Swiss-Prot record:
The keyword Cytoplasm applies. GO terms for cellular component: eukaryotic 43S preinitiation complex; eukaryotic 48S preinitiation complex; eukaryotic translation initiation factor 3 complex. This is Eukaryotic translation initiation factor 3 subunit H. It comes from Chaetomium globosum (strain ATCC 6205 / CBS 148.51 / DSM 1962 / NBRC 6347 / NRRL 1970) (Soil fungus). The lineage of its organism: Eukaryota, Fungi, Dikarya, Ascomycota, Pezizomycotina. The keyword Protein biosynthesis applies. Component of the eukaryotic translation initiation factor 3 (eIF-3) complex. Pfam families: eIF3h_C. InterPro entries: eIF3h, eIF3h_C, JAMM_MPN+_peptidase_M67A, MPN.
């Protein structure tokens, strides 16, 4: 069961918890890797707590498995949550679940990710599609690459109310962003995730022997004690943490971080080009207005009818400012990669200091 609670305050939403034991998203995301996998999650709102009871994937169009068609499959899967055919499919699935007495209400959707690379326009459009009808819906992100390291990577997000209002207006200009004080940190609101094990798994974990609490172990008094309580070895520690090689996930994250920084600078260069074009056109308009005022002054001196001074609106056309949304998403993705690199370097730095200590002469 997956639960999410949210309390309403005067200015912001305060998320509480999400817990998940439904393995449909994880299996679907892992089997579809590296293609993006999306699906719907259903449940109910129980006294402010969203309980996720089931999940099912969206049907996708079969394409060739070659590299030339992989991007097409990813694009189709990324746009699946807001496709008309999948909306009808989702409603039909919810109707069937209710027929078998399953608490099934639309509470969000899930998607897969690779090394935290999920903050894009398609993700925003999908979440806005769900959240505009129900502000309690969440986007569940399962990072398959991070989960392959042994620790489940499952995160939940909502769009902030400020970003929802700005996205509804469709204005992401410099003036509107300065007026609303909206930054890239205000795009998403993360909901903490708590994973609950099933009863069978909990029972199995309790059966795993633990190391002795004290160094002195009482000896058995008889042979019957040995037969009744045979010695069980505890779980062995992992020696992979002693590997001195650089984590390949750290290298890949650094590559993705550099790509995001390049995309951010490309968007910044486009905006600077727009500013240069705007300054050039405004200078031409100022020159034209100065010339027209001089002509009108001469015509008034000659007792002639002055020419219209607003004719520049027909002669000149100011360039349209590009949307700053893509730049905000790139900045948010750069922050995401930076946090991942910071998490990786904690263990890498320890290994580097250990190697340095062994290399230095005593």
């Amino acid at each position: 069961m997956c639960r999410a609670s949210r309390r309403r305050s005067s200015h912001l939403y305060v998320p509480s918890q999400i817990s998940d034991k439904d393995q449909v998203p994880r299996h679907h995301c892992s089997s579809s890797f590296p293609t993006t996998a999306t699906g719907s999650i259903v449940g109910m709102d129980n006294n402010g707590v969203i309980e996720i009871t089931n999940a099912f994937p969206f049907p996708t169009v079969d394409v060739s498995g070659t590299d030339s068609h992989q991007s097409d499959a990813t694009s189709l899967a990324a746009a699946a949550p807001r496709a008309k055919a999948n909306i009808a499919y989702q409603n039909e699935m919810i109707r069937h679940l209710k027929e078998v007495n399953v608490d099934a209400n639309n509470v969000g959707w899930y998607t897969s990710a690779t090394m935290g690379n999920f903050i894009n326009l398609s993700f925003i459009e999908n979440q806005h599609h769900y959240q505009r009808d129900n502000d309690k819906t969440v986007a569940l992100v399962h990072d398959v690459s991070r989960s392959s390291q042994g620790a489940l990577s499952l995160r939940a997000f909502r769009l902030s109310p400020e970003f929802m209002a700005a996205f509804k207006e469709g204005k992401f200009t410099t003036e509107s962003l300065q007026k609303s004080k909206l930054t890239f940190r205000d795009i998403l609101v993360e909901v903490p995730v708590v994973v609950h094990n099933s009863h069978l798994l909990t029972s199995f974990l309790h059966q795993i022997p633990a190391p002795p609490k004290s160094a002195e172990i009482p000896l058995p008094a008889s042979l019957e004690d040995i037969r009744r309580d045979p010695a069980q070895l505890p779980a062995h520690p992992s020696f992979d943490t002693l590997d001195l090689s650089i984590d390949p996930f750290l290298e890949k994250t650094c590559d993705l971080l550099l790509d995001s920084i390049e995309s951010h600078y490309s968007d910044l260069n486009n905006h600077q080009y727009y500013q240069r074009q705007l300054t050039r056109e405004q200078f031409k308009i100022t020159q034209w207005q100065t010339k027209r005022k001089a002509e009108n002054a001469a015509r008034l001196a000659a007792k002639q009818q002055p020419l219209p001074e607003d004719e520049w609106q027909r002669l000149f056309k100011l360039p349209q400012e590009p949307s700053r949304l893509e730049g905000m998403l790139n900045a948010r993705q750069v922050e995401q990669y930076s946090k991942q690199v910071d998490g990786f370097t904690a263990s890498i730095t320890t290994k580097m200091f250990a190697v340095r200590g062994n290399l230095l002469p005593e």
